[in-house]
């Protein structure tokens, strides 16, 4: 028995030695071959190596990427399978063999020479005699990328457009809808939250800007990571961060913690736009890309409509609240914040059913995973179209040469946090290097011009869209002030005031032995008045002040008449007992003004629907650049009419007009950005440009709102000049219509 075992072991060792020698000679012959493509994209025939004219004992296999073109060669080479018993590192079983995945002839782990050097043209290997992997020229890498782009486009056409893309459309639409909701949340809750959190004007301003700052950080962070870790994975993480901190923000009581939660919520949702557009574009064929990316933009509008409708339906219902002592209050506006997290939560659940982008897999040398995803796309669409018998004929997909960038650490090296720290630093270095490559010689001009277009459009758009509601509120305040009633020189004695006084000015009045019980004062001013032996009890006030008044022997019991409401006034022998608890600041709370904010936002977001439809239908017909420049010019012209907006209704109409014509330029800009950068830089560049967009939004909002109530002469020229500059820069960018995705 032992002798038989030894003979068998010796036989196996001998067979392995022979196999190694055969592989060594075959590899030497293959290295001399030419890595070429034979009419790959018109005849769907891909040939990896040319045969030599001399003695060719091992004919090169036909590496065509469709089934049936290399069947004979595969049958001839079937006896030389690597799946042999007792195989070692040089004879590994192909890792996808047991999953039914076609073997990738470039990029496979098992394709090595006997001395350990990779084959020519294989991922990480030599190419056309250029030397070691680190010496591969950028021209060769660009050639590989162009070949992959053409091949990938042909495969997407075979997969078709159908149920899979529409399912992904609605899933990613939820993520984009969550971004649209996030922009409006803080603006809608401020009229109610300012009372609960006792917010000053500076606090409210910071709360309004913190969301944009968070989205700016998130866009750059998640955009860079998505090119290294994957679109789906980073989108799941970013949406999870958004939903978790949006949920927490609805329960926290203090201003600081609420501000922190909204900041991190903005960081989470910041990754939505750059990842969603890049992710969806990599499942769309060239003839469908512009149109369907434009349809996807509609979900941002739907998010704004959803937020406005929920605010209108929830916030005014004060009964939807509860209180635990005087320290914890949960009012209806917190319910609204909670409801606004639903799109993000639903997007997370739906996204778990979707695969990663196959283009990302191919860019990272993961042929097997990419093939399985593309097969899933093909089979899903064919079944939905009633052709389940159609077979996915792709057998080989080209992968890009990969450089060794990751730092591997053995599990027994250092502590776990040291290993994670090194990996995090390595990943951060890769992300930063990828970002800097966007400013390399090949993409520097495009990136700088895109920065100009994104900045100018965002500066004018966000600045004007926030300036519009502020101008409407200013016009409302002017109209309200014009209806103020003035009561000069009145003398009142022994009268009990137990009703509401609103929008009144009392000048030079004298009040003796009067009682103010259960009185509500709203926008009331007492000037140069005398109060002697009066009694104030259970008085609530807003925007009420006593200027240059004198109080003698007067008692204030359970009122909210705090010290700052007495401007240059004298109090002689007057007493304050049991002042009301709560915010000592003067806030307006909810009311007609809050309803107007919801209504204006609802109309403004709904007004972009026609622009969305037109841009989707014409995007692939007239091109991205014409759409972008034309919409920007129309927006610039619409700014001219702002000078004639002197009433509330006129300003609302102009807001709808501006939003309707400017949305097409945003859609075109999103589609253009996706097509200008290659797949390994797409989300990084998109994230950086979107972060710049949020920075411009902060600057635009700060500058434009400072002119509210002063003049319209400054904001309108600013916006018009920015839009004109952006449209002129856009015309100098390359057109991406009719081009395959890089």
Curated annotation (Swiss-Prot):
Modified residues (Phosphothreonine): 84
GO cellular component: neuron projection; synaptic vesicle membrane
Transmembrane region(s): 170-190, 206-226, 234-254, 263-283, 295-315, 335-355, 448-468, 599-619, 627-647, 652-672, 691-711, 713-733
Record field: compositional bias (Basic and acidic residues): 33-49
Carbohydrate-modified residues: 498, 548, 573
Record's keyword terms, sorted: Cell projection, Cytoplasmic vesicle, Glycoprotein, Membrane, Neurotransmitter transport, Phosphoprotein, Synapse, Transmembrane, Transmembrane helix, Transport
Keyword Transcription: no
Residue spans of biased composition, Gly residues class: 122-137
Region called Interaction with SYT1, residue ranges: 1-57
Gene Ontology molecular function terms on file: transmembrane transporter activity
Compartmental location: Presynapse; Cytoplasmic vesicle, Secretory vesicle, Synaptic vesicle membrane
Pfam families: LD_SV2 (PF23894), MFS_1 (PF07690), Sugar_tr (PF00083)
Residues exposed to the Extracellular side: 191-205, 255-262, 316-334, 469-598, 648-651, 712
GO BP terms, alphabetized: chemical synaptic transmission; neurotransmitter transport
Alphabetical list of InterPro entries matching this protein: LD_SV2 (IPR055415), MFS (IPR011701), MFS_dom (IPR020846), MFS_sugar_transport-like (IPR005828), MFS_trans_sf (IPR036259), Sugar_transporter_CS (IPR005829), SV2 (IPR022308)
Modified residues (Phosphoserine): 80-81, 127, 393
Predominant place of localization: other
Post-translational modifications: Phosphorylation by CK1 of the N-terminal cytoplasmic domain regulates interaction with SYT1. N-glycosylated.
Cytoplasmic side, ranges: 1-169, 227-233, 284-294, 356-447, 620-626, 673-690, 734-742
Topology within the bilayer: Multi-pass membrane protein
Entry-annotated residues carrying Phosphotyrosine: 480
Region span, Disordered: 33-144
Oligomeric and partner information: Interacts with SYT1/synaptotagmin-1 in a calcium-dependent manner. Binds the adapter protein complex AP-2.
Family of this protein: Belongs to the major facilitator superfamily.
Functional description taken from the UniProt entry: Plays a role in the control of regulated secretion in neural and endocrine cells, enhancing selectively low-frequency neurotransmission. Positively regulates vesicle fusion by maintaining the readily releasable pool of secretory vesicles.
Identification of the protein by name: Synaptic vesicle glycoprotein 2A
Organism of origin: Macaca fascicularis (Crab-eating macaque)
Recorded name of the encoding gene: SV2A
